[in-house]
């Protein structure tokens, strides 16, 4: 969980569905497959995945008196003890150094608000189950980065959470190998129909609209698609319209300013994005520092940031 400046209390993450908790991601694969990750507006302490392995480099000061082989043996013993859920006073036969280090490790675990999944599992972003809450996902990345895959996952979960609602697709492409394989497939809206008869916003009451690579439209198509995006972004809360806007650009001056201001979630692909573009977006719209943005580069293929309180950050294996 990434700490964003301005928060007085650090919100907590857990698998516990308690009052006030909001779902943010679903675990796919591994031991925790099917579990939902919730965010709490306080420092709630709840169930989490098993901690990942202990990294000796984080405790070099405590380990410096030991030989390399002894360090490995000690870390392995403490790893086994932590996996069993043992307290420090339950370490029978352990050295004083080992017990002291183990207490430090457990203290670090208690303070850590982040969650890391093993390689055999991953997070999938979850839309809100609240029928009265609409969301705006801004998903930006180069061609082939996986924007359609992320959008498909969100839209399919939206349909499961709200089975009576429709998912619409507005795209320049007549066919999409990812989005069109949703089950059931999204209902396509032709660009020409928007040009010929611009729709009233009430026609998008209680639904989800996917705008696929909307920045590639030109001419009249560009005008009507951008107008519809702007109208739904600013007034879609009245029609309860969730939006998934896929773009090649992280920022594009006036064309993206309004949408980015209204977005509830921003999904980016740090490893395939220039540091300048990434840091500008995250500093301007999230409040991240340059060091925060450098950390994003280490978090995997994609990163999703929730802009509103309580703010959170989630990637493929980390939250």
What are the functions of these language-model segments?
Residues 177-187:
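Short, aromatic/basic amphipathic alpha-helical patches
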Residues 124-134:
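Phosphate-binding P-loop
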Residues 289-319:
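Conserved AAA+ ATPase small/helical "lid" subdomain
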Residues 16-125:
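N-terminal pre-Walker A segment at the start of P-loop NTPase domains
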Residues 134-157, 172-176, 189-290:
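Conserved P-loop NTPase motor cores
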Residues 83, 96-100, 110-114, 118-122, ...:
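Conformational switch/transducer regions in large eukaryotic molecular machines and scaffolds
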Residues 156-167:
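Post-Walker A helix-loop "phosphate-sensing" segment adjacent to the P-loop in P-loop NTPases
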Residues 1-2:
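Histidine-centered divalent-metal-coordination microenvironment in nucleic-acid enzymes
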């Amino acid at each position: 969980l990434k700490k964003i400046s301005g928060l007085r209390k650090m919100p907590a993450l857990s698998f516990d569905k308690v009052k006030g908790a909001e779902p943010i991601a679903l675990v796919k694969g591994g031991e925790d497959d099917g579990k939902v990750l919730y965010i709490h507006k306080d420092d709630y302490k709840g169930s989490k995945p098993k901690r990942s392995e202990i990294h000796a480099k984080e405790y070099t000061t405590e380990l410096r008196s030991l030989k390399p082989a002894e360090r490995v043996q000690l870390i392995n013993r403490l790893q086994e003890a932590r996996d069993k859920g043992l307290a420090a006073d339950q370490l029978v036969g352990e050295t004083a150094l080992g017990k002291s280090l183990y207490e430090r490790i457990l203290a670090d675990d208690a303070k850590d608000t982040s969650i890391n999944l093993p390689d055999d599992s991953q997070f999938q972003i979850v839309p809100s189950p609240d029928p009265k809450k609409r969301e705006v996902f801004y998903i930006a990345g180069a061609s082939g980065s996986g924007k359609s895959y992320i959008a498909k996952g969100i839209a399919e979960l939206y349909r499961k959470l709200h089975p009576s609602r429709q998912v619409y697709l507005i795209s320049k492409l007549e066919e999409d190998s990812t989005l069109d394989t949703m089950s059931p497939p999204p209902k396509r809206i032709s660009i020409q129909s928007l040009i010929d008869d611009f729709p009233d916003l009430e026609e998008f009451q209680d639904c989800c609209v996917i705008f696929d690579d909307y920045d590639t439209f030109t001419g009249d198509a560009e005008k009507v698609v951008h107008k519809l995006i702007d109208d739904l972004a600013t007034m879609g809360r009245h029609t309860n319209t969730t939006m998934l806007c896929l773009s090649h650009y992280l920022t594009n001056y006036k064309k993206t300013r309004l949408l980015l201001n209204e977005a509830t979630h921003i999904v980016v692909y740090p490893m395939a994005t220039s540091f300048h573009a990434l840091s500008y977006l995250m500093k301007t719209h999230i409040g991240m520092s340059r060091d925060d943005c450098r950390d994003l580069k280490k978090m995997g293929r994609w990163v999703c940031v929730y802009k509103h309180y309580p703010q959170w950050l989630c990637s493929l294996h980390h939250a």
